[in-house]
């Protein structure tokens, strides 16, 4: 724990390389910034710089640091570093322009004691995912991949996301694969319609709750855009199959959502993606998305007529490791 290490126990050094925790500023977190105890670890960097007085430093953090708290968080950081006697520069850099087949935006903050360091004079070049992929590797034969290729060809799944959270032509949904039980065309069409309809802000106004991306709708509300006989039984069958859930709308309470039991329950998509063996089939003619540790094992590559995960070597290339 760096907070418990006195600077007298740290050897002298010339350059500090540091990355303070990104969760307080990350779009994947709650973006609490310095309110988060992890966000205060920047001040440990300041403490060490003040005591050891190295020639320079290079700090790294996520894109969210730029605009967090209206830019005030970054301003505090830069001001504190300048007050220590450093010439400070910073820039948001995207790895896709520096030879990596991955879009990964990061803020770099650099400082030295005698000059500003330019972060605008790098040679830029791009590569695509296909440039770093291996071929002919073993593919995965599992119930999931068998289901996938019983409904789609390998060529059809390239570039597709597999999740039930949103719609669109680039998504494949669990009901289109029959993962929880084979569905009829009518059931598929309805679920695709509900997936889009539940996002409309008018439902939040009608229910009397802050809008959320995916409102649970009652059978009566659903009947206003989808009419059929025995609608209630139709919906309940999809609940029994596991494609729909019956739940209360969720009200906003501070930085999270909790069920509002004063509102009637409605039907909602059972959303999620990490429950799927694969959640994204990468396109070799494009870039990989920003890699997240918990998601990377769910990324798929079409290879040799089947589907496999990224190899270790491919993962290393995506992160900029040299071939040796």
Spans of features found by a protein language model:
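Extracellular/periplasmic catalytic domains that process cell-envelope and extracellular macromolecules
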Residues: 9-10, 101-103, 282-285
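A SAM-dependent methyltransferase catalytic signature shared across enzymes that methylate proteins
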Residues: 77-92, 113-115
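Flexible, glycine-/basic-rich loop-and-beta segments that form/coincide
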Residues: 100-179, 185, 191-192
């Amino acid at each position: 724990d760096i907070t418990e290490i006195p600077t007298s126990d740290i050897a002298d050094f010339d350059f500090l390389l540091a990355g303070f925790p990104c969760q307080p500023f990350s779009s994947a977190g709650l973006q609490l910034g310095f309110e988060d105890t992890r966000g205060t670890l920047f001040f440990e960097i300041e403490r060490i710089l003040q005591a050891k007085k190295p020639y320079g430093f290079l700090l790294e953090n996520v894109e969210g640091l730029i605009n967090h708290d209206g830019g005030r968080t970054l301003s505090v950081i830069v001001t504190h570093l300048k007050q220590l006697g450093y010439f400070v520069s910073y820039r948001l850099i995207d790895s896709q322009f520096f030879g990596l087949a991955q879009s990964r935006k990061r803020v770099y903050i650099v400082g030295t004691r005698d000059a500003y360091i330019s972060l605008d004079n790098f040679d830029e070049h791009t590569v695509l995912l296909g440039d770093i992929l291996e071929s002919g590797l073993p593919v995965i034969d599992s119930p999931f991949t068998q289901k996938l290729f019983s409904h789609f060809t390998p060529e059809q799944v390239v570039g597709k996301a597999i999740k039930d959270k949103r719609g669109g032509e680039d998504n494949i949904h669990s009901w289109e694969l029959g993962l929880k039980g084979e569905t009829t065309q009518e059931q598929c069409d309805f679920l695709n319609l509900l997936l889009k309809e539940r996002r409309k802000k008018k439902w939040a106004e009608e229910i009397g709750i802050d809008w959320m991306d995916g409102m649970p709708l009652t059978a009566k509300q659903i009947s206003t855009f989808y009419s059929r006989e025995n609608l209630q039984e139709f919906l309940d069958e999809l609940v029994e199959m596991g494609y729909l859930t019956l739940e209360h709308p969720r009200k906003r309470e501070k930085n999270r959502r909790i069920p509002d039991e004063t509102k009637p329950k409605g039907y909602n998509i059972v959303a999620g993606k990490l429950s799927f063996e694969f959640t994204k089939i990468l396109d070799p003619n494009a870039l990989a998305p920003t890699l997240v540790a918990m998601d990377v094992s769910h990324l798929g590559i079409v290879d040799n007529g089947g589907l496999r995960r990224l190899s270790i070597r491919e993962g290393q290339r995506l992160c900029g490791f040299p071939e040796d």
